Amino acid sequence: MAISKAWISLLLALAVVLSAPAARAEEAAAAEEGGDAAAEAVLTLDADGFDEAVAKHPFMVVEFYAPWCGHCKKLAPEYEKAAQELSKHDPPIVLAKVDANDEKNKPLATKYEIQGFPTLKIFRNQGKNIQEYKGPREAEGIVEYLKKQVGPASKEIKSPEDATNLIDDKKIYIVGIFSELSGTEYTNFIEVAEKLRSDYDFGHTLHANHLPRGDAAVERPLVRLFKPFDELVVDSKDFDVTALEKFIDASSTPKVVTFDKNPDNHPYLLKFFQSSAAKAMLFLNFSTGPFESFKSVYYGAAEEFKDKEIKFLIGDIEASQGAFQYFGLREDQVPLIIIQDGESKKFLKAHVEPDQIVSWLKEYFDGKLSPFRKSEPIPEVNDEPVKVVVADNVHDFVFKSGKNVLVEFYAPWCGHCKKLAPILDEAATTLKSDKDVVIAKMDATANDVPSEFDVQGYPTLYFVTPSGKMVPYESGRTADEIVDFIKKNKETAGQAKEKAESAPAEPLKDEL
């Protein structure tokens, strides 16, 4: 199962913060102070004129932001500088922004699946093609990245000099080698380049010998992917669009992804955590003696199990605080290895030794391991208006209590959650005499969220009745609106019993 965007942002943000020098911190603070300055080149949009603005421009970048967001404030001056520079481009490249925290603009945030701030999206062809912006966040980098994005998706390589200028030995570069720039193979290659241009750089050529390590006798057509890790070059002759996308995806991630302070590794980390495949993660201290012996064994294990549906990561504890928080790990368990499978079940081996890694992985593949669950301790005292639930008691509390439960999944750092907290307290106090109703909350950063709940952002609220009916709460955020919703939708004990009795009985099953 892929990790939510909000958590991926936290995982990588912590690594970036840890790697940034003090001077960067001072610059960021200065930027935050000036972040509210009026922008001139950035186009300000709202729900009323958004569609019209998108329809006017064949290419436009839109930042969805919140005024209280620190990262948005840091981006603001860089985004404005980039907008000023890009306004001189021929044709001009338009940068815009939308306050997604404004009530009137929230439908836009929902429509475009905005789950964190700031989120930047590229609108192409009057909004017919929408892609995530995956480039730098400083002015010079934004300008360079967007100039590439408005050009052709794939650039023709006509000479060795072109190849030298385009193919960076520190980045992934994908080249289509053809006998002629036409036909199904070429068309499919350009289609994939257009679709994936936000993620990769593409080129095409009629002359394989122009390329690094080129071979004039190469059998064409061919796709050659250059990368700064593992085997450095990998080829494919399958030009089916889906097959080509899978080839690029599989080939563009290291056999073992490294989670450290090096920002060059962050694109691979992003792909790793976004993948729906099972993930094996070894965390240890990179600066201690045993690191090399662990690394050798772990890379060997990744090679041994390369045909399994699993990806591998090795992480330095100094850069992995976000991962430890997400998975519920502790530094006193290091060295440790943890697996998250495609269904989000986790399996943990703390204090692992190098010679235990392969055998433990085999036990996982053989289905012999018991899952690990992240949970805070069950509260000994739980007498506040809003009750605290944790992973170890959420099923009993929410699904087996015989009550109507409004449960909030929150993050301690979430601004919206902080605003909602006193409102939920007020609603719970109003309803305290109703023995059929409970309002509860779970820290979703410190507990595994049950699979029954789809939590993609914070706060997320669900209303669960005694009969098991479960609906997302998407009504108003005032205490009166919450109370009104609960009163209209709650079940009495008698109603719940009637629904349970009228439900069709499940057929008996032979467990053998």
From Swiss-Prot:
<feature type="active site" description="Nucleophile">
    <location>
        <position position="414"/>
    </location>
</feature>
<dbReference type="Pfam" id="PF13848">
    <property type="entry name" value="Thioredoxin_6"/>
</dbReference>
<feature type="site" description="Lowers pKa of C-terminal Cys of second active site">
    <location>
        <position position="477"/>
    </location>
</feature>
<dbReference type="GO" id="GO:0009960">
    <property type="term" value="P:endosperm development"/>
</dbReference>
<dbReference type="Pfam" id="PF00085">
    <property type="entry name" value="Thioredoxin"/>
</dbReference>
<feature type="disulfide bond" description="Redox-active">
    <location>
        <begin position="414"/>
        <end position="417"/>
    </location>
</feature>
<keyword id="KW-0256">Endoplasmic reticulum</keyword>
<keyword id="KW-0676">Redox-active center</keyword>
<feature type="short sequence motif" description="Prevents secretion from ER">
    <location>
        <begin position="509"/>
        <end position="512"/>
    </location>
</feature>
<dbReference type="InterPro" id="IPR013766">
    <property type="entry name" value="Thioredoxin_domain"/>
</dbReference>
<feature type="signal peptide">
    <location>
        <begin position="1"/>
        <end position="25"/>
    </location>
</feature>
<dbReference type="GO" id="GO:0006457">
    <property type="term" value="P:protein folding"/>
</dbReference>
<feature type="glycosylation site" description="N-linked (GlcNAc...) asparagine">
    <location>
        <position position="285"/>
    </location>
</feature>
<feature type="active site" description="Nucleophile">
    <location>
        <position position="417"/>
    </location>
</feature>
<dbReference type="GO" id="GO:0003756">
    <property type="term" value="F:protein disulfide isomerase activity"/>
</dbReference>
<feature type="site" description="Contributes to redox potential value">
    <location>
        <position position="415"/>
    </location>
</feature>
<keyword id="KW-0413">Isomerase</keyword>
<feature type="region of interest" description="Disordered">
    <location>
        <begin position="492"/>
        <end position="512"/>
    </location>
</feature>
<keyword id="KW-0677">Repeat</keyword>
<dbReference type="InterPro" id="IPR005788">
    <property type="entry name" value="PDI_thioredoxin-like_dom"/>
</dbReference>
<feature type="site" description="Contributes to redox potential value">
    <location>
        <position position="70"/>
    </location>
</feature>
<feature type="domain" description="Thioredoxin 2">
    <location>
        <begin position="372"/>
        <end position="491"/>
    </location>
</feature>
<feature type="disulfide bond" description="Redox-active">
    <location>
        <begin position="69"/>
        <end position="72"/>
    </location>
</feature>
<feature type="site" description="Contributes to redox potential value">
    <location>
        <position position="416"/>
    </location>
</feature>
<dbReference type="InterPro" id="IPR017937">
    <property type="entry name" value="Thioredoxin_CS"/>
</dbReference>
<feature type="site" description="Lowers pKa of C-terminal Cys of first active site">
    <location>
        <position position="137"/>
    </location>
</feature>
<keyword id="KW-0732">Signal</keyword>
<dbReference type="GO" id="GO:0005783">
    <property type="term" value="C:endoplasmic reticulum"/>
</dbReference>
<feature type="active site" description="Nucleophile">
    <location>
        <position position="69"/>
    </location>
</feature>
<dbReference type="InterPro" id="IPR005792">
    <property type="entry name" value="Prot_disulphide_isomerase"/>
</dbReference>
<keyword id="KW-1015">Disulfide bond</keyword>
<dbReference type="InterPro" id="IPR036249">
    <property type="entry name" value="Thioredoxin-like_sf"/>
</dbReference>
<dbReference type="GO" id="GO:0034975">
    <property type="term" value="P:protein folding in endoplasmic reticulum"/>
</dbReference>
<comment type="function">
    <text>Probable protein disulfide isomerase that plays an essential role in the segregation of proglutelin and prolamin polypeptides within the ER lumen of endosperm. Required to retain proglutelin in the cisternal ER lumen until ER export and, thereby, indirectly prevents heterotypic interactions with prolamin polypeptides.</text>
</comment>
<feature type="site" description="Contributes to redox potential value">
    <location>
        <position position="71"/>
    </location>
</feature>
<comment type="similarity">
    <text>Belongs to the protein disulfide isomerase family.</text>
</comment>
<protein>
    <recommendedName>
        <fullName>Protein disulfide isomerase-like 1-1</fullName>
        <ecNumber>5.3.4.1</ecNumber>
    </recommendedName>
</protein>
<feature type="active site" description="Nucleophile">
    <location>
        <position position="72"/>
    </location>
</feature>
<feature type="domain" description="Thioredoxin 1">
    <location>
        <begin position="32"/>
        <end position="151"/>
    </location>
</feature>
<keyword id="KW-0325">Glycoprotein</keyword>
<dbReference type="GO" id="GO:0005788">
    <property type="term" value="C:endoplasmic reticulum lumen"/>
</dbReference>
<dbReference type="GO" id="GO:0034976">
    <property type="term" value="P:response to endoplasmic reticulum stress"/>
</dbReference>
